[in-house]
């Protein structure tokens, strides 16, 4: 199938899907009955909210906004990594960034005498992901111009397993924090509040314009490193900027929702299938699709455990695992 060319279909369908699922997420599967009309009125200013409307404003709306921001950020990070490494299997989860950030968060939660929140957590997660990413790139030869793509993925999988092993040891040694860390490791937005929105929003608002401004250079990088260099792209600076943006995005997401997997791996392929290979289209479409997938996973997580709740990461794993196997077989 060729990429969608008509702008109404290219942009209209993903935007419409996101809006519809966002609206449904505000009132579906609620322990306290909430109607679609309640959800709509909750978004309108100038009146005293009823109990269902207050529930939407204080719980459901920040939860859905956090899901949108995290889905868009992880999809964008995955697209950038696949472009940067010329590897269709690259993602924050497979290259060890998620697990490194999660290990840093788990160690901080277990060892810190006082709770840490806000941008400090994002910074800690970004540092953990950055150290893990450097180790993967070094072990997998990712800093060489002619690196083995499979070697890079294998290094990422090995380091991810190592980090997750250390995280489990942390759980065993820090029994007082074990349940909270365990639930957080599953990846989800069930505990998201407005402070999480304000924690994520500046990172996303800062990163997205920079990435979109680099879209033309990323198009050249898609051809080959040598072609991009010949056409005037400063590869060292571009790689540094992209790596920093990826670490900021992933660190912020992991600090709020835990290590959510598969969005960064699958969504870039869906975006290229839908929008072609022009990064000016692929980058924003991947953000729309990532936000929609994360929201959908959160709604399904509520549906499967209603009136309880499941982490959205568990649903994404159920969806992503067979898709990952299909992707591996398709790539031969």
From Swiss-Prot:
Record keywords, A-Z: Cell inner membrane, Cell membrane, Ion transport, Iron, Iron transport, Membrane, Transmembrane, Transmembrane helix, Transport
Pfam families: FecCD (PF01032)
Function: Part of the ABC transporter complex FecBCDE involved in citrate-dependent Fe(3+) uptake. Probably responsible for the translocation of the substrate across the membrane.
Result when mutating residue 63 to C: Retains 74% of wild-type citrate-mediated Fe(3+) transport
Cellular compartment(s): Cell inner membrane
Inducers of expression: Induced 1.8-fold by hydroxyurea.
Protein name: Fe(3+) dicitrate transport system permease protein FecC
Species assigned in the record: Escherichia coli (strain K12)
Stretches assigned to the Cytoplasmic side: 1-7, 86-100, 144-151, 221-244, 329-332
Example GO biological process: intracellular iron ion homeostasis
Membrane-protein topology: Multi-pass membrane protein
Gene name of this polypeptide: fecC
Effect annotated for changing residue 60 to E: Retains 29% of wild-type citrate-mediated Fe(3+) transport
Chain ranges on the Periplasmic side, renumbered to this chain: 29-64, 122, 173-199, 266-307
InterPro entries, alphabetized: ABC_BtuC-like, ABC_transptr_permease_BtuC
Family recorded in the similarity comment: Belongs to the binding-protein-dependent transport system permease family. FecCD subfamily.
Ranges annotated as spanning the membrane: 8-28, 65-85, 101-121, 123-143, 152-172, 200-220, 245-265, 308-328
Complex and partners: The complex is composed of two ATP-binding proteins (FecE), two transmembrane proteins (FecC and FecD) and a solute-binding protein (FecB). Interacts with FecB.
């Amino acid at each position: 199938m060729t990429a969608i060319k008509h702008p109404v279909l290219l942009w209209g369908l993903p935007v419409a899907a996101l809006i519809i699922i966002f609206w449904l997420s505000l009132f579906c599967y609620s322990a306290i009955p909430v109607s679609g009309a309640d959800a709509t009125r909750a978004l309108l200013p100038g009146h005293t909210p009823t109990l269902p409307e207050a529930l939407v404003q204080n719980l459901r709306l920040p939860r859905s906004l956090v899901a949108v921001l995290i889905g868009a950020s992880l999809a964008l990070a995955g697209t950038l990594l696949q472009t940067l490494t010329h590897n269709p299997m690259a993602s924050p989860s497979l290259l060890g960034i998620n697990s490194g950030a999660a290990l840093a968060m788990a160690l901080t939660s277990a060892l810190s005498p006082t709770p840490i929140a806000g941008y400090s957590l994002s910074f800690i997660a970004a540092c953990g992901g950055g150290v893990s990413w450097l180790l993967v790139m070094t072990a997998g030869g990712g800093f060489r111009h002619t690196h083995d793509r499979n070697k890079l993925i294998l290094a990422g999988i090995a380091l991810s397993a190592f980090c997750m092993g250390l995280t489990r040891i942390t759980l065993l040694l820090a029994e007082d924090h074990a349940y909270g860390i365990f639930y957080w490791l599953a990846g989800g937005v069930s505990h998201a509040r407005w402070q999480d929105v304000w924690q994520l929003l500046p990172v996303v608002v800062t990163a997205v314009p920079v990435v979109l401004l680099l879209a033309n250079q990323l198009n050249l990088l898609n051809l080959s490193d040598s072609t991009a260099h010949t056409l005037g792209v400063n590869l060292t600076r571009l790689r540094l900027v992209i790596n920093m943006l990826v670490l900021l995005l992933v660190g912020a997401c992991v600090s709020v929702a835990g290590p959510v997997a598969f969005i960064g791996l699958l969504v870039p392929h869906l975006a290229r299938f839908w929008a072609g290979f022009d990064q000016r289209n692929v980058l924003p479409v991947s953000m729309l699709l990532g936000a929609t997938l994360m929201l959908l996973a959160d709604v399904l997580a509520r549906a499967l455990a209603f009136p309880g709740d499941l982490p959205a990461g568990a649903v994404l794993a159920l969806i992503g695992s067979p898709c990952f196997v299909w992707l591996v077989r398709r790539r031969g």
